[in-house]
């Protein structure tokens, strides 16, 4: 006979055996494959589960113990290592002589007496020369102005005169794209058809028919109480003033420092070591020459410069230019020959015409009618009025009460409330057999006579209100 556990005997769904992750009653290494999924969904033998990717323990270590030798220990033997001798320095004994605090600069460079050096200035001439300098620059002596005729310009004469007749030549764009007149387009707008139905639209809705207006109560407005000033006069007293009264004490002393602290009445000594060693030399008085008073001339100004007045142009011929004159050939072709011109003669060349593709489209000469595919092939049709399948309104509904019968009340058949077998300490009709390795309590069905006795016992147990139920927590 088939045995059952608490999970299989329960009919209310509140009793089940604890699903433990490991077997607490069986000491085996087999994994526990029991779960809620495996209980509800049976295993199909036609489908095999995939193998585990966990590596297998195929490696078996040898019984010989491993030697504690490495390549470094085997090839390199130990040598005697002596400790490093540390040099012992002599103990420092401070000298009893005093330090002279002299530097190398003071030892090598002895001081010498310092005297002032007179400034190096050019000697002043007490007797200035009043003669005027008569000299002629080299440029004016060598290059004298002369009268030379003006050269004729080498540019060509401007002989072009635009024609007075209008330019009648046409362009390629004007030949290919002639001006065409306006194209009359056909309107695709449908004609205004007369309305087939003149019945006005009913604006009656279910809300307007079933809505019943109720009188609205007047809104309650809360009136604020008027402010009443207090009749007791305000004494400007607070809890602080009443509880803590001021006491007479010493006046506060000022912590402001004095404007001039005592002991600083002596003047500040602004002398330094540099000012004591290096005194200022007596400076002689600077010689200043008195300016000469300006005396305006009595003669009339001749408006001549010094060069114009004293340097006149002597008689002489203009200097001849050493630059060769330009040999200009106004007519004839240059017939100079070179090796390149002799070897590579010029040949007659014809202008190549551009390669134009053969036009594959024949452009129409008629103007474009501006018709699209839709306008050319579209055939207008009259609109078809579809028949409405909406049922006609049968008028407002009366206050007919709703039937209290529903599908649930008609088709529902009450059943007797039976007690779950798993709620008993010992389920009736079953005897406890064992607890398996996963903690499931296995029960075995008894014989017919035993089941009748157990049924009597179950009735007696149901009459006892203090009977303890079996509760197995997950």
Curated annotation (Swiss-Prot):
GO molecular function list? microtubule binding
Q: What Pfam families is this protein classified in?
A: SAXO1-2
Mind telling me which InterPro entries this protein's record contains? SAXO1/2
Which tissues does it occur in? Widely expressed, with highest levels in testis. Expressed in mature spermatozoa (at protein level).
- Name its GO BP terms in alphabetical order: cell projection organization; cellular response to cold; cold acclimation; positive regulation of cilium assembly; protein stabilization
Could you tell me the keywords of this UniProt record?
Cell projection, Cilium, Cilium biogenesis/degradation, Cytoplasm, Cytoskeleton, Flagellum, Repeat
Q: Where in the cell is it found?
A: Cytoplasm, Cytoskeleton, Microtubule organizing center, Centrosome, Centriole; Cytoplasm, Cytoskeleton, Cilium basal body; Cytoplasm, Cytoskeleton, Cilium axoneme; Cytoplasm, Cytoskeleton, Microtubule organizing center, Centrosome
Annotated region Mn 9: the residues are 300-332
According to the record, the residues making up region (Mn 6) are 200-232
The lineage's top-level taxon is Eukaryota
Q: Where is this region: Mn 1?
A: 30-64
Q: Where is this region: Mn 5?
A: 166-199
Q: Where is the composition biased (Polar residues)?
A: 448-457
Q: Which family does it belong to?
A: Belongs to the FAM154 family.
Q: Briefly state the protein's biological role.
A: May play a role in the regulation of cilium length. Stabilizes microtubules at low temperature.
Q: How does it assemble?
A: Associates with microtubules via the Mn regions.
Q: What is the name of the protein in this document?
A: Stabilizer of axonemal microtubules 1
The gene name reads: SAXO1
